[in-house]
């Protein structure tokens, strides 16, 4: 039997080519994910710097100024310091729950970014249930906080975890009802479709003007979900030392620190997408590339402008939660629960009823 070596070489080269295609396919699939993670990380560093500068301005003092120009690298310096600190585990706690809790809190928030459109056709996963996927994923984060509080075997930590779970349940429902009203108004639950539905009449087409009640409820509920003042009861320093973070140190404490700012950024991005027109320039009858005198070949420039508009709206909105931190006093736990169940829930239900009625009458 004579074996043709050329055929064997052809088969081997073909198999190598197929394996290379698979490797390139995996790499190409990971590129947008890694790009999104890098962008989110830079965005969080910018938020930390902005909060410190705005807080310093409100308190009439000088903010960070030594780590980099204008103190822009201060957050990076703090993160590096936490990396080199020792990770302590309570001797009487549950080490598995203690270690898994911070990871669940961070990963669940990271997944929420997958459905956020940063520009036209610039979204990691354009799903038909995008906004409700965010609601579902954000409900997982308090489970990690409760696990952290229970695994610490500390009364302050456990009470902080219970507060985080109760607060999340109380404000998740009004938040979901506001999102449902937006979905009914836009006839879609896709984040991309919701942005495009607001693009017809410039800034007059924003859902902010069509859903003012829902916007206020969404704003208050998102602040409570982010555990920002005046809703920071799960980690109230005067009562619970640091809440569920009391026993944490090093990188695990840093994960909670990152999670709080990740949650703040994702909430602001969803406010931009749901109520402020997303990536649209919001000037009627003007398309971004045409405004800057470029033709359809300038899609890259148009995409960059869309990203810039989205981030500009997001960071301008961030002034509200940062200012409320130094303006409003902390609520009591009974006041927080009463606000969620007795005020925001009926108001959001009434807003949903009004939206449904208006949509039925317009048919």
UniProtKB/Swiss-Prot annotation:
The family note in this entry says: Belongs to the complex I subunit 1 family.
Q: What is the lineage of its organism?
A: Eukaryota, Viridiplantae, Streptophyta, Embryophyta, Tracheophyta
Species this chain originates from = Atropa belladonna
Tell me, what does this protein do in biology? NDH shuttles electrons from NAD(P)H:plastoquinone, via FMN and iron-sulfur (Fe-S) centers, to quinones in the photosynthetic chain and possibly in a chloroplast respiratory chain. The immediate electron acceptor for the enzyme in this species is believed to be plastoquinone. Couples the redox reaction to proton translocation, and thus conserves the redox energy in a proton gradient.
Does the UniProt entry include the keyword Cell division? no
Task: Please cite one Gene Ontology biological process associated with this protein.
Answer: photosynthesis, light reaction
What does the subunit comment say?
NDH is composed of at least 16 different subunits, 5 of which are encoded in the nucleus.
- Keyword annotations for this protein? Chloroplast, Membrane, NAD, NADP, Plastid, Plastoquinone, Quinone, Thylakoid, Translocase, Transmembrane, Transmembrane helix
**GO (cellular component) term, any one:** chloroplast thylakoid membrane
Compartment(s): Plastid, Chloroplast thylakoid membrane
Q: What reaction does this catalyse? A: a plastoquinone + NADH + (n+1) H(+)(in) = a plastoquinol + NAD(+) + n H(+)(out); a plastoquinone + NADPH + (n+1) H(+)(in) = a plastoquinol + NADP(+) + n H(+)(out)
**Primary enzyme class:** translocase
- Give the bilayer topology: Multi-pass membrane protein
Main localization category: plastid
Give any GO molecular function from the UniProt entry: quinone binding
Protein name stated in the entry:
NAD(P)H-quinone oxidoreductase subunit 1, chloroplastic
